[in-house]
Amino acid sequence: MLNDSVPAHVLVRSRRIYSTSPDGAMLGAIAIRGDSIVAVARESNSLDSLITPTTCVIDDPTLTWLPAFYDTHNHLLEATRNATFVPVNRARTVAELVSLIREQAARTPAGRWIQTSNAWHERKLAEGRLPTAQELDLATRDHPVILRRGGHMAVLNSRGLEASGITAATPDPPGGRLGRLADGTLDGMLEGGAQYALVHVPPLPIEEQIAGVEQSCRMFTASGIGTVRDPVVSPEGMRLYQAAAEAGRLSLRVRPMLLMFPSGSVAARIAQIEGFAMRSGFGNEWLKVWGLKFVMDGGPEGGALDEPYVTDASFRGHLNWDPEEMFAVMTAAVQRGWRVGTHAIGDRAVRTVLDIYERIIMANPRLPAGMFVIEHAFLADTTERARAIRMGVHITVQHALLHALGASLLRLWGPDRTRPIMPVKAWLDEGADLSAGSDYPIGFYEPVRTIWGMVTRQTETVGIQGPEYAIDRETALRLTTVAGARLSGEPNCLGPLAPGRFADLVAFRADPITCEIDRLPELKPVMTIVGGRAAFDPEAMFASKAAMSVGKL
């Protein structure tokens, strides 16, 4: 396919360029002008007529090129904690974790909050548990401390509890739980939505926040990611993204989801939606609002199950939202043009969310396609999968969660409910619309590791879980690239390497599709191009002639 009326700013030649187009074409050349692909060809020299004296030609037959990855569930703003806050992932004991916080306290003015990164898990500690408020007090009593783990667990020290107004008399908030010792004393643990409902940490200065976003973007583009869908963004987070975009410091595309809390009246939550003064699709090619995020249940410790937890016969997890209230708020959202994505991992949560979606669709039969998504859907049997497929509900899956949380899931849910978690092959065989991501910072973020994980179903510490749900590499590649374009409603500008699409592509020295499977998770890109410019180029293969300015809202 050739458009010889326009010269190329960049020409890529290689023997192996995976287009991921429906016909599975392998390309030999791609011509880029500005931020878009203008021509592709199967022969490497077929586009040479588009070369001018200023064209940047990247001619390396040993490289394998793919579309840049689209991580459809990546907490980019949360990832900035890893660059900014206490790196507790280095600790291997509770004492080491406390020591890291103590070191930060020595450099921090008294009274100022100390926060930790959340890309870690207590399974890495010798004690295999979260520390208590009393243990965090050993680090400092002069600073409020919040120790975050992933998006669903946190621990405060005593000063943090005091600063947040949390006492032994404080009731559990909707969708959350306060941890207590046997005598009723608070142990500092905040499960589920408790940290979001009860703790309000002052933000860092805006320049520090923008620098953190910029550093996270560089980390992700170095792994080949060109677009992320950030599933938990507050209005303040949205303003941060806008500031970063306006400053030209987004090196990848972001599709934010504004988070809806389960607290407050239905009328107040509908008023909140109306107050956003935007809706799905607002923005430009670099920063565009995807929709709203609802959270129906928790993580492995709080996912809403039909049957009791292995560790507690009286506990089946909890639903964060009253179903009738979610129905009312969600109906108002979709009627105002908002897409909705809902976190649901337990079978009871998945079924309840599908019940709500079905009621909304029946009451609003003219809604456009692509309005409803379930994030994760850990447990979905044949009946619920069929319902989701019939309603056109998109499912986002993240093998990194099974990889990182396998041991916890086995302990809490048991083997019969761990093996079929995120049954990707079953979903696809039955006709579901799926896309893949990482849910970083809970698990790994590298897309090649996501592909490896979906092919092997391997976990970090408890072996292979559910091998019957594994898929092949080319299918996994599509789930980590072009599937995201469908989810975003942008199939004409993102996705396959084809004329008219954005020039978002990534190069590897080895072929991720054909290399030995054990080598796959260790592969590193040598270049990532986003919007026709080098977002990652450690070997300086890309000439600055083709550089473009970042679009602004």
Q: What are the roles of these predicted feature ranges?
A:
Residues 331-341, 345-372, 376-377, 382-514, ...:
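His/Asp/Glu-enriched, well-ordered alpha-helical/loop segment
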Residues 514, 534-545:
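Short, charged low-complexity linker/loop segments at the C-terminal edge of domains
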Residues 284-304, 391-403:
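Non-cysteine beta-strand/loop elements that form the S-adenosyl-L-methionine
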Residues 244-248, 277-287, 388-392:
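Acidic (Asp/Glu)-rich catalytic clusters
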Residues 2-14, 18, 22-274, 290, ...:
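Divalent metal-binding segments
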Residues 117, 148, 398, 506-509, ...:
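Residue-level recognition of conserved beta-strand edge/terminus positions
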